[in-house]
């Protein structure tokens, strides 16, 4: 071979050997001008490439923030939650809309407890003026007079009386009303001796009847703190939300059973807020209104200057469609005051029927609801929770209602098409026939109607949802 090749090769090889022999003998030295590190050429050559620690940290965080595809829209919320965990300053708030599944602060109470234990916070959020399950709710003690007119998604006239963020409007009145159930017994057919029908029979039936009655005295509502996880034993920041006050409208406020203080209310349309925060925390507050005042009252918020808050907005029997009953300008006003970081929509059970195979009408209605929320609260992510498994009797035994998988698929589609996140509760429960396991569990996780959850079952769902909201993962 040509000598011109070997000569440079031998020189290079000799230099490498010389460095390998002499380098370990050179002592390490530090000075203000330069530093010499002790070198092990063989170890250096065999070692894996160094990775910048900052880049490595970011990479690890990226792995931790891996978000399931159907939950990608939660990324802004997850980032804010991560910041909240680091500095514990500022508020992070969730508007949790749902049907009877979350009545009495079920699911949301436990979710609030878990989030506040991890990220701070003190208070139950925005609470309505009256509630049909106020005695069942454990996270706040809630009492009120009988002379409030209640308007909701489920009551006609919400176009005349715009609803607030809670899904209700409450108006003080000089009267109240109550519902009673009128039952009619079955009447058998009457036949003559030849078998001819003399009088036709009638099946047993029942109907609801509303009775109106006069009430003397003012309209009032009282809230008290409770020492229950997910609730608050005392109130630190208190804000009243209302609209359509007159020039003479007032509210009288008593703290801890003390003397009443009268506050003038801002007249006019639009959502108004009155800050009633005490100088020091209180355990009880009573608000009193004139029964002839035209004011529309929406609710009272209990929170603090920092922490995570979950507002429970349950309306029994509501499908989730027709959210435009809350005017966009009202929703935008609540957003300015309360600054929601996430809207959760838990619906579907009230449109579910074993006979239905096409939910396109429901899809259209829910899409309109989501678009309405998005226009009123731009940039706020929305999480659609799919309908739970529910069972109906088929061939003598309970099985998953045949429409449930179809409804879940429809909800997944409408979430994707509206840019919303989607959590498949049916799948999280275990899928087909999982409700049967919830009913038969010990302790029981669901009621024997094979639709609703017990408190223990709701707590189980809250833990699953907590993982979804804090990790962005379904598994």
Regions found by a protein language model. Name each.
Residues 97-100, 312-317, 345-350, 385-389, ...:
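Active-site-proximal beta-strand/loop segments in catalytic clefts of secreted hydrolases
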Residues 342-348, 367-374, 381-386, 390, ...:
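Conserved, well-ordered alpha-helix/loop/beta-strand core segments that scaffold catalytic motifs
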